[in-house]
Structure formats: C-alpha cells, structure tokens
A protein has these predicted regions:
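Mature, function-bearing regions of proteins
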Residues: 1-286
Length: 286
C-alpha cells in the first residue's frame, strides 16, 4: 500500500470501531519516524511530574539499564499496536506492562497523564512537523486507541474527547509540573541514553538541540537552562524542511514494523517474556 492508498482506506473506516487499523496505518505506514520522535518527547514530558519521576528514580532502571528500559517500553507498545490489543501477543504485552507497574502505588491521575501525553504530543508534533496533517479520523482513532488500552490498564475517568483530554492535561500540568531532584536525575539519564546513540564528538552539539525541542516549563522542571532562540528557530525550520522533502518522496509500500527491527538491548532479537523490569512483577493495577 502506498501513496493515497493509506489515506483512502483510513477515510473509509470508522474511528470508533476501526481505531486499531487506523492507528496501525497512520503510525506504521505514513508516520513511523514522527511517532517515534514524538513519543520520545512524550516520555520526557512525564518526567516533569515529581510523583512520576520519583517512582522512575526509585526503580533505578534509567540509571542501571536505560537502553533495556527504553527498548522494552517501545517493544511492548509495538507488540500491542502491530498484533492488536486483544490478540494473544497484545494481551501478553499488556499483562507484562500491568505487572511492571503493579507493585507500586501509582495514582490514577499519574497514569492518566502519561496516557494523555501519548495522545496529545504526537498530535501536536503532526500539526507542526507532519508531512501531511492527520485526518479527523486519525485524530479520533488515536484517542479511541489509547482509551481502549487505558481501560485494559484499569485507568479510570479517561476523557472521551481530545478537547476534554487536553483541558484535563493542561490543568494537571499547572498543578503538578515543577522542579524536583528526581525529575532532574531521570531527565539526565534519559538524555544521556539518547546522546549515547551518536559519536562522542557530536554529543555536545546534539545536547542543546534535544533541549530545544522541550518547552520552557519542562526545562524549568528539570532545572535546565533555556536554549537560545536562534537554536529553537533553526531546529523548527529544519523539521519543517524535512516535512516538505518527505511529502515529495515516494510513499512507503510496506509498513515499518518496530518488532522486526534491531534493538540495542536485544542485538540477537528478543522474546516477549524478556520484556519488562526483572524481579518487579506483581499484581496488576486496580
């Protein structure tokens, strides 16, 4: 499937019933790179909430096994999207995710905020940097997809519209986004992971570029200096230029499947039962 074929199929589908198919087509055919980048930013955004960062800091996973933690999260979400929420592998991936979280007392609002970032950050990225804009079906399907997954994680009171979810998220941030030492540590560890993927001489140049993608309120929550305006502007222009170029390239003929790609923590491939935090399985959240 290529070209207009993806959009044409999406336009024939119902976002309330066919949200899994729409999300798969959108993510794996048309926007694999964009979704990967925006979800990385979404994770960063959650670290600015002290109650979330304190838990991540306590587990020490980002300190001791940052690449495995990153790959496990990416692969669990990919297993669910590529195979289906209620497929055998999708259910097992969700079960493992629930058990990873189940030994900790996590507030429903913290769960809901993480889910909200997974909906809202990719939407905002697409509106600014997508090579085409999401259709209304894609936006609605994203909400229904994450609502369905959230319910299987026993997350309560998930708003049923993007507008309500955005209002809730903004209010939550105003009340909770602030500096904490745990936020700084987890942000430092994650930033160190991202930079480790590039040659050492480039890392001092790439660090401010990554920070330029974060908003000022989040930078303040991490205790980071704000990057210069010219860097933000230059990066914005570069990402918009990329979108213009990608729009003129031939469309992908086959989906990009994250589960089939090589991952640094699993150079020889992975088994589903390897995903998750060792020794931290317990009850599912309730």
């Amino acid at each position: 499937m290529a070209g207009r074929g993806v959009v044409e199929e999406i336009e024939r589908l119902d976002p309330e019933k066919d949200f899994e198919r729409i999300s798969f087509l959108s993510t794996n055919h048309d926007f694999p790179w964009d979704v990967e980048q925006s979800l990385s930013l979404a994770f960063f955004k959650t670290y600015g909430i002290p109650s979330i960062s304190a838990l991540l800091d306590e587990t020490a996973e980002f300190r001791d096994r940052p690449q495995k933690r990153y790959d496990d999260t990416e692969l669990i979400l990919a297993e669910i999207l590529e195979n289906g929420i209620d497929s055998e592998r999708g259910r097992e991936a969700t079960r493992r995710m629930n058990r990873m979280h189940g030994r900790f007392e996590i507030r429903n609002d913290d769960y809901l905020y993480v889910l909200a970032t997974f909906v809202l950050v990719p939407l905002r990225w697409n509106r600014r940097y997508g090579w085409r804009r999401y259709t209304r079906q894609e936006e609605q399907a994203s909400l229904h997809y994450w609502r369905a997954l959230g319910k299987r994680m026993n997350i309560r009171a998930i708003p049923d519209s993007i507008e309500d979810l955005e209002r809730w998220s903004d209010e939550f941030e105003r009340a909770n986004l602030r500096f904490s030492e745990s936020s700084r540590r987890v942000a430092d560890q994650t930033l160190g992971l991202f930079l480790s993927w590039y040659p050492a001489p480039l890392r001092p140049l790439l660090r401010p570029a990554v920070l330029a993608l974060l908003d000022d309120e989040l930078l303040d929550a991490f205790g980071y200096h704000h990057p210069p305006a010219w860097l933000r502007h230059g990066l914005d222009l570069a990402l918009r230029a990329r979108a213009t170029i990608v729009a003129r390239l031939p469309r992908r003929s086959r989906p990009r499947l994250m589960t089939r790609e090589r991952h640094r923590a699993y150079p020889g491939g992975y088994r589903l039962e390897e995903l998750g935090v060792p020794g931290l399985e317990g009850r599912a959240p309730g």
